[in-house]
From Swiss-Prot:
This is Uncharacterized protein BU473. It comes from the Bacteria. It holds the Pfam family BolA. Belongs to the BolA/IbaG family. InterPro entries: BolA, BolA-like_sf, BolA/IbaG_stress_morph_reg. SUPFAM superfamilies: BolA-like.
Amino acid sequence: MTLEKIKKYLISKINIKFIEIYDDSQFHHYSKKGLTHLRIIIISDDFINQTLINRHRIIFSMLSKMIEKKIYSLTLNTYTLNEWKDKKLKKTSNVKCVKKNNIL
């Protein structure tokens, strides 16, 4: 199993505007080798009117066979396109300068 294989599989199942998969396995002590800790960001309008729990259920059900056999931890960030745009705007508009020792 590779990140690219997971990405292609998810893209074949739902209408994805953006997907990014990160392998965080190296940050964890776990006895198995390979992909054990994944973080996935998915932007899809298929998530419109879906609760966060339902969004995660959709993705977990698609990856259930992979999860039970190989993946120890899966972090999901699921957004609609509008939610993602709002999140990006809030992130950039909340930038604050920190003043230390009277130097900006």
